[in-house]
Amino acid sequence: MRLRRKPWARPELAACDFYVDDPPSYKGRWREFFDNSNPIHLELGCGKGGFISELAADNQNINYIAVDIKSEVLALAKRKIEKEYKERGIQEIKNIRLMSHNIELIDNMLDTVDFIEKIYINFCNPWPKTPYKKKRLTHGKQLIKYKQFLASGAEIWFKTDDDGLFEDSVKYFEENGFIIKYKTWNLHESGFGENVPTEHEIMFSEEGIPIKFLIAEYKQKIHQAVCIGINIKEEN
C-alpha cells in the first residue's frame, strides 16, 4: 500500500535530535557518534517504528540504528519512538538514530570498524520474480555487504510471512558463511521467548499466516569445515 506524501514529514525529521540527515558522513564513526562503547544493532526497514521503539526502550544499554528510505514512514517512526519513551518515563532518547538511506547501498554508511553486533530484517519485500530476487535484503549480494561491517559472532534476526523467501534465505545464509542457530516455520507456536512483534507481524498473525523466523550467526574467517557437527536448533 502506497503511503501518501506528508508535507510535514521532512521538516519534522530535520528538527529531530535523533534523526541523522547524512548517514554516509558517519561511516566508521558510529561509536563516536553515540558517544559510548555500547553494542550497536541495526534494523533494516524500520517502517513506522513499532518494533524499534519497543526494543530500544527495553534495552537502554544498546545503541540502535534504524533505517528506512521513506521520510513519511520515518516521521511516523519518530513519533512512535517519542510516544513509547514518554510513556515509560524515559527523559532522553539517546540510544536510537533514525535515518533515510537506500538499504541496497548500506555499505556506503557502515564500515568494518563500526562492528555491528546484530541486524534485524523484518518482513522485507519478498521480490518473488527471478529477475528481482537480487533485491532481497537476505540475498547473497546483500549478505556480502553486511559482512563488511559485522562483528565476529554477530547475528541476523530475520522474520517473514513468505514461505519462498524464507526457504531461499536459509540457502543464502548458508552459502555465505553464516550458521543457522535457530529456525522455525511458526514463530508464535515455537516457544521462542525474545520476540518483539512488528505491525506487519500482528496483521499477518490475525490472518492466520504463520511467521517464519531464523537467527543466522556470522563468524569472521571461519573455515567451512568448522561448521560440520554444529547443532542447529529447529522448531517445526
From Swiss-Prot:
Pfam families linked: Methyltransf_4
Pathway of action: tRNA modification; N(7)-methylguanine-tRNA biosynthesis
Superkingdom, taxonomy of origin: Bacteria
Sequence positions that bind S-adenosyl-L-methionine: 43, 68, 102, 125
PROSITE patterns, A to Z: SAM_MT_TRMB
GO cellular component: tRNA methyltransferase complex
Transferase is among the record's keywords: yes
Binding positions for substrate per the UniProt entry: 129, 161
Documented EC number(s): 2.1.1.33
Entries under SUPFAM superfamilies matching the protein: S-adenosyl-L-methionine-dependent methyltransferases
PANTHER family registered for this protein in UniProt: 3-DEOXY-D-MANNO-OCTULOSONIC-ACID TRANSFERASE/TRNA GUANINE-N 7 - -METHYLTRANSFERASE (PTHR23417), PENTACOTRIPEPTIDE-REPEAT REGION OF PRORP DOMAIN-CONTAINING PROTEIN (PTHR23417:SF14)
Purpose of the protein: Catalyzes the formation of N(7)-methylguanine at position 46 (m7G46) in tRNA.
Record-given protein name: tRNA (guanine-N(7)-)-methyltransferase
Organism whose genome encodes this protein: Ruminiclostridium cellulolyticum (strain ATCC 35319 / DSM 5812 / JCM 6584 / H10)
Lineage: Bacteria, Bacillati, Bacillota, Clostridia, Eubacteriales
Name of the encoding gene: trmB
